[in-house]
Amino acid sequence: MLIAFLVGGAGGYAIRKYLAEAKIASAEKAAATIIEEAKKEAEARKREAVLEAKDEVHRMRNEVERESRERRNELQRLERRLLQKEETLERKSETLERKEASLHRQEEAIQRTREEVEKIRQQQVSELERISGLTTEAARNILLKNVEEEIRHETAMLIKQVEAEAKEEAEKRAREIITYAIQHCAADYVAEATVSVVNLPNDEMKGRIIGREGRNIRALETLTGVDLIIDDTPEAVILSCFDPIRREIARIALEKLIADGRIHPARIEEMVEKARRELDTKIREEGEQATFEVGIHGLHPELVRLLGKLKYRTSYGQNVLKHSLEVAFLAGAMAAELGVDVLVAKRAGLLHDIGKAVDFEVEGPHVNLGVELAKKYRESPEVIHAIEAHHGDVEPKSIEAGLVQAADAISAARPGARRETLEAYIKRLEKLEEIANSFSGVEKSYAIQAGREVRILVKPDKIDDAMAVRLARDIVKTIEQTMEYPGQIKVVVIRETRAVDYAK
C-alpha cells in the first residue's frame, strides 16, 4: 500500500514536471513569436517613416523651388516696370526742358514789353505833371485822402447797419428763448401768508389750549415765538408769525397736543421739541424732493438740508424754494435752446438763493453767504460764479451765469409773484429780533403781535432781575434810535430759573 502510494506520488510528480516544462516551452515559443512579430512591425514602421520623411523633403523642395520661381518672376516684373518708369521720366524730362526754354524766351519778351510800357508811362506822367502842375506824390496824396474819406464813411454806415441788424436779431432770439422757457415752466403759486390755521374738534378745546390763567398759551408762545390768536372764529386757532419755520413748529406741536388731549406746560415743551425733530426730517425730505424734480445729483447733504429750509423762507411774499425751482427750470430751458451746459445752469439756478437759508442766522447779504456756502461744500467754479453774479454785483462772465440772472429776474418780475409790503413787514420783525439778540446774555427773542411786542428770553446765570430791567430799557432805547415804526413796541424780558432734582 505504501509502495503503491509512493509510486503514484512519484508518477504524479513526473507528470506535473513534464506538463510544467511543456508550458514553459510553449510560453517561450510564444514569446519568441511575439518578439519576432514586433521586430517585423518595427522594421515596417521604420521603413514607412523613412518613406514619409523622403516624401516630405521632396514636397518641401518642390515648394521652395516654386516660391523661388515666383519671386524671380516678380523681380522680373518689377525690373520691367522700373525700366518703363525710367523711360517715361526721361521723356517727361525732355518735355520739361523744352517748356523751360520756351518760358525763358517768353519771359524775355515780357520783360522787353514791360520796359517799353514803363518808358511810355514815365513819358505820360511827365506830360501830366507838366499839364496839371502837381507832382506824382502830391496827386497820390490827394487821391488817397479822397478814397480814405469815402471808405471811412461807407465803413461807418456798414458797421451801424450790421450793429442794428445784430441787435434786432439778438433781441428777437432772446424773446423767443425766454418765451419758450416760460411756456415750458408753468409754475403754480400762491403768495405765502404769515398765518396758519389749526382746526379744532370743538370750541371747548380753546379753553384747554389757553389753560388755567393762560399758562398753556403762554408756554406755547414762549417756546415757539408764535402768536396764538384765539377769537370768535369757530373751531379754529390762528398762528401768526413772520418766521415760517417757527410757525410750522407751533402748528405741528399744537396739532399733536390736540390729538393727544393732554395739554399742560410740560407736555407742550415735549411736543414742541418733537415737532422740531419732525420738521428737521421734513426739511431734508423737501430738499431731496427739490433736487429730484430738477434732476440734480451729487449735492452735499448740508446743501440739500439748506434747500429744504428755503421752503420755509419767503422773499417779498414769494416762497424761496418754489422761486429757486422756477429759476432752475427757466435757466435749464434757456440753456438747452442756446446749446450750453444745461446741468450747470439748473444747478446754479437751484442754488442761487441758498444764502437765504442762513441769512437770518448769519450776518451778511444772501449773495455773499451763498457764495461762501457753495465754496465750503465744493461746488464748481461755474456754479459759484453764477451765484455771485445773479444780482449784478459781479459782471457775468459765462453764459450760464447770465441765464441764471435772467431767470431770477423773470421769476421775480412775474405779476403776483412778490409783495413789497409783506417783505417790509417781515424785515421790520427781523430787525427787532436782531436788535434784541445783539445784547449779551440774551438766549433768544421773538417778535410777536405783528411787531408790537418783543419777548426776550435771557440766560438766568448771566442776567439777574436788576440787570433784566436795565436790559429792557437798553433795548427800548436802541429800537427808538434805529427804527421807524407806528405806535409803540412792548419789550418783555423773561428770566426763568429752573431747579430740577429726582427722588430715588
From Swiss-Prot:
GO CC, alphabetical: plasma membrane
Alphabetized UniProt keyword annotations: Endonuclease, Hydrolase, Nuclease, RNA-binding
Biological-process GO terms, alphabetical: mRNA catabolic process
Name by which UniProt lists this protein: Ribonuclease Y
Major enzyme class: hydrolase
KH domain span: 194-279
EC number: 3.1.-.-
Family under the similarity heading: Belongs to the RNase Y family.
UniProt keyword Cell wall biogenesis/degradation, yes or no: no
GO molecular function, one term: RNA endonuclease activity
Pfam family, one: KH_1
Disulfide partners: none
Biological function: Endoribonuclease that initiates mRNA decay.
Domain (HD): residue spans on this chain: 320-413
